[in-house]
Amino acid sequence: WWKPMGRMEKSWLTVAFVWCVFLTVMMPLWYFYGKQNVPTETYRTSPADYGAKVNAFVEQYTVGEDIVNGVTLPVVAAPPGSDVYIRASTWQWYPILQLEKGQEYRLHISSLDLQHGFSLQPVNINLQVIPGYDYVATITPTSAGEFTIVCNEYCFVGHHTMVGKVIVTEEK
């Protein structure tokens, strides 16, 4: 560091500088033109109002029950093109969604109590779920099967048990 830079050191510093400029330009371009971002809308809501919407949704479209982590939850199948609701509350994703492959849905996600992380595995879709906000993502399932929802934001003692499910069936 106390001697003048040699030819190799100047070359590597130039490469590093050009790479930094390239990445600085590419980050915003990739954000807008890449296909990796989940298209979302966000609305203010109250936990009570959102809970009422979820309960009305479950009451209208329940088709059965399933067990997740020893808890019986309703399985809800809304018609394609409709709004579907999922609620995060202390250590539970509610209800279990049943969707059709190849059909578009507007998925509403909110929390009633704490900040949670919505992680749909193995697809690896990740969203932060915060009380007071209704996050709406337009989704189209591309493969059939059972997918697991994991909370990836520590939400206190029962965090490790916060698992939900999305069932995607073949088109009718």
Stretch-by-stretch model annotation:
Residues 2, 6, 120-143:
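Extracytoplasmic beta-sandwich strand-turn segments characteristic of Greek-key/jelly-roll folds
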Residues 91-98:
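Short, charged beta-strand/loop "edge" motif centered at a coil->beta-strand transition
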Residues 111-115, 143, 155:
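Short, charged beta-turn/beta-strand-edge "cap" motif at the junction between a beta-strand
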Residues 102-103, 141-147:
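Short tyrosine-centred short linear motifs in exposed loops/low-complexity segments
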Residues 1-85:
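Extracytoplasmic entry segments of secretory-pathway proteins
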Residues 82-86, 108-133, 164:
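Histidine- and aromatic-enriched segments that form or immediately flank copper-ligand environments
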Residues 152-160:
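Short, exposed beta-strand-loop hairpins at the edges of beta-sheets
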Residues 166-170:
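Interdomain boundary/hinge segments at the C-termini of tandem beta-sandwich modules
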